[in-house]
């Protein structure tokens, strides 16, 4: 915080001077808190959920009402809808199963086993309570997840002892096997529409325009890049006396044009499902101008009067359905549905920006005075980098360290004749391009021709870190000085000859980024001569 009264006093005396000098009140960010080593934090949605919401809004804009269809479908409904081909269809359905309730009595042998656990059943009341609990469970009155608690409660025991009784006295529970039920998980939205429409007939005036977007489950032989065992169906129905196949074409165009598709083709579907009227099952192909190709995106048809009659539905019903995942793959440019739906099971790809964010300065001083000294040292290096050797330049500064004042003198030197004070790579900058990390020089004059194109692309198209070699090395120097202050060391020397790795320029990279670079055979190439020689003296 700064003193506002003092600032205003200075401004009243000399505004221009105050305007310039008060810039020092706004502190610069620490080196590892400067952009691009900071980035905005925000949540991320899944493409499937995005597409579901887009489809919901698209249907609503077209005047459809949203309904939730039953997920659990009795197998008899599959027979009603598919007729003779029901058995083949049921092969792709998941059946539900449940554990039977064992008929467990409380015999004298069971009571003896309980008492061997150190539990006294010394009254008829306790026996009756336990017997009643087991009976209620058998009849389905008592839920399975309450059984341990109720066993313990009937005998006045802790939950732990109730569980022990269940495990050691009633092994029947361990041997239970699930028994199949005549109930299936919905394999396609049509199974739910027949049930829904049947219930709505006579309750709501015709016509109906309904849609539902929800999960379906299909027992695929295996999952691959285009098939999952659970997927989302975006399905709609038009129900009314004058419904025709042309309504399906219009709905398909109206819906899909909201997702960037332009031209449409309607082709007879060779599958010919029995719940559709013959010659009405139609595949929708749509042209996507960005992808420049025709894509199969939906199917529609008119439900068979035979199937409708089994549900007392006496008017035509047009049904259109499409796979949400299919549309999401098109819109988000995915080739494998598994990677889109379940990204957590696959390697995450870091962008160049992400990698640039992951590169940090390793050693940084904590004291503000040393951070300021770092900036002054960088200026000294840049200003004198081309000074001819033998030569030396120095910077001297007093800083407060606990209750003492220390004088720090940093000297840059080069003793060998005919050289510059510093090597030609000190102003190289770090860029990330195509997953590679490069040290890019200011000028390409002395760069081998074979490297010019790569380095030029990195400079012009890559993600910058805004870090030069001299910046990061100077932070290492002042960090070493801070360590010397703490250990009461008076003198130290630091050399930075030829750079070969990130650590040579006081940089580190997050493990995930490094793993990606190595795993994808990318490179970290920041080679370059720095030839920096430093000696430091610390005096009271």
From Swiss-Prot:
Q: Which GO terms describe its biological process?
A: translation; tRNA aminoacylation
Q: Quote the catalytic activity from the record.
A: tRNA(Cys) + O-phospho-L-serine + ATP = O-phospho-L-seryl-tRNA(Cys) + AMP + diphosphate
Which organism is this protein's natural source? Methanococcus aeolicus (strain ATCC BAA-1280 / DSM 17508 / OCM 812 / Nankai-3)
Instruction: Return any one Pfam family short name.
Output: tRNA-synt_2d
Tell me which EC number(s) this protein carries: 6.1.1.27
InterPro entries xrefs: aa-tRNA-synth_II (IPR006195), aa-tRNA-synth_II/BPL/LPL (IPR045864), O-Pseryl-tRNA(Cys)_ligase (IPR005246), Phenylalanyl-tRNA_Synthase (IPR002319), SepRS_C (IPR041590)
Lineage at the top is: Archaea, Methanobacteriati, Methanobacteriota, Methanomada group, Methanococci
Q: Does the keyword Oxidoreductase feature in the UniProt annotation?
A: no
Q: What is this protein called?
A: O-phosphoserine--tRNA(Cys) ligase
């Amino acid at each position: 915080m700064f003193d506002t009264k003092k600032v205003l006093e200075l401004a009243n005396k000399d505004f221009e001077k105050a305007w310039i000098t008060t810039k020092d009140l706004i502190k610069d960010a620490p080196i590892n808190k400067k952009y691009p080593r900071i980035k905005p934090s925000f949540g991320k949605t899944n493409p499937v959920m995005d597409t579901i919401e887009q489809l919901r809004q698209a249907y609503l804009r077209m005047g459809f009402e949203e309904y939730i269809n039953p997920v659990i479908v009795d197998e008899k409904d599959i027979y009603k809808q598919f007729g003779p081909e029901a058995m083949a269809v049921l092969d792709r359905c998941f059946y539900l199963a449940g554990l039977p309730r064992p008929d467990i009595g409380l015999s004298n042998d069971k009571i003896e086993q309980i008492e061997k656990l150190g539990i006294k059943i010394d009254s008829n009341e306790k026996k009756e309570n336990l017997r009643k609990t087991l009976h209620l469970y058998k009849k389905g009155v008592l839920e399975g997840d309450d059984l341990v608690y109720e066993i313990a409660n009937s005998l006045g025991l802790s939950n732990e002892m109730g569980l022990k009784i269940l495990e050691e006295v009633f092994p029947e529970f361990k041997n239970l096997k699930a028994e199949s039920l005549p109930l299936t998980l919905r394999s396609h939205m049509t199974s739910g529409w027949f049930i829904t429409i049947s219930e709505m007939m006579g309750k709501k005036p015709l016509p109906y325009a309904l849609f539902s977007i929800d999960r379906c489950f299909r027992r695929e032989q295996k999952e691959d890049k285009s098939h999952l065992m659970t997927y989302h169906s975006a399905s709609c129905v038009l129900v009314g006396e004058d419904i025709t196949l042309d309504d399906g074409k219009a709905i398909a165009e109206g819906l899909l044009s909201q997702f960037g598709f332009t031209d449409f083709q309607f082709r007879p579907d060779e599958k010919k499902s029995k719940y559709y009227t013959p010659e009405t099952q139609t595949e929708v192909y749509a042209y996507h101008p960005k992808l420049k190709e025709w894509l199969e995106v939906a199917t529609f048809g008119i439900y068979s009067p035979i199937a409708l009659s089994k549900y007392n539905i006496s008017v035509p019903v047009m049904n259109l359905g499409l796979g949400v995942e299919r549309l999401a793959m098109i819109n988000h440019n995915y080739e494998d549905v598994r990677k889109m739906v379940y990204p957590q099971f696959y390697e995450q790809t870091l962008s160049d920006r992400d990698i640039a964010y992951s590169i940090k300065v390793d050693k940084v001083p904590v004291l503000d005075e040393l951070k300021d000294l770092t900036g002054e040292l960088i200026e000294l290096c840049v200003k004198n980098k081309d000074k001819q050797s033998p030569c030396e330049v120095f910077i001297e500064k007093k800083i407060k360290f606990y209750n003492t004042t220390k004088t720090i003198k940093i000297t840059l030197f080069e003793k060998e004749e005919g050289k510059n004070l510093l090597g030609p790579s000190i102003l190289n900058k770090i860029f990330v391009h195509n997953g590679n990390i490069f040290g890019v020089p200011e000028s390409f004059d002395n760069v081998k021709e074979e490297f010019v194109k790569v380095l030029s692309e990195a400079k012009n198209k890559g993600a910058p870190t805004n870090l030069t070699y001299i910046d990061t090395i100077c932070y290492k120097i002042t960090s070493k000085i801070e360590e010397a202050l703490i250990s009461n060391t008076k003198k130290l020397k630091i050399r930075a000859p030829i750079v070969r790795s990130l650590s040579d320029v006081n940089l580190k990279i997050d493990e995930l980024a490094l793993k990606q670079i190595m795993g994808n055979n990318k490179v970290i190439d920041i080679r370059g001569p720095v030839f920096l020689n430093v000696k430091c003296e610390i005096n009271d």
